[in-house]
Amino acid sequence: MGGLGSPCGGCKFLRRKCVEGCVFAPYFCYEEGSSNFAAIHKVFGASNFSKLISHLPDHDRCDAVRTISYEAHSRLHDPIYGCVSQIFSLQQQVVSLQAQVVLLREEASRRFPQDDPGCNMKQQEKVLAQQMPQDLHNWFHQGILDSDFDPMSGTTRDNERSMDHNESPCSSNESLNYYQEVNFPWSV
């Protein structure tokens, strides 16, 4: 049940009374939870969602809810491909960057032949870094290094909210405040 007698986000969306032991309450808070639940309900259905969650071990449910919510938002944004379009886009970026690495290595081998004893790898990297195309350099430093997105957990580092352990089986770093934790490639 949500805090202080208020329904959880799932029950709020379904306009029903939130009972103790509600399957949605640990994952959908009153404030932001109804919009996340709305996406899940529209794409998968509340009944299918509750059946899926009830068959999972308790320790896997937070990750499953986070994943299902992300997939639902992706499907609403792109009804045909859903999150597959994002995966494909990232794969294309990887292929492009791998091709650039190959080109830079070839250029380095031309500029610094292996038989030159005075040349070391640090010098090669320094010269190549100075000659790296500015747009690639900016993209890498702004998009990857300066990002607060943690790809291992799928969350942002400064926007994790803490939850009372009596309120939810999710630990504080697994809270489901999706708008702050998940960096959707579109505006939510």
UniProtKB/Swiss-Prot annotation:
Tissue: Expressed in roots.
PROSITE patterns tied to this protein: LOB (PS50891)
Domain of life of the organism encoding this protein: Eukaryota
Renumbered residue ranges of the record's region Disordered: 150-172
Disulphides: none
Domain LOB, first and last residues per copy: 6-108
Matches recorded under InterPro entries: LOB
A Pfam family annotated for this UniProt entry: LOB
Biased composition (Basic and acidic residues): 157-167
Family: Belongs to the LOB domain-containing protein family.
Stated name of the protein: LOB domain-containing protein 14
Chain's gene name: LBD14
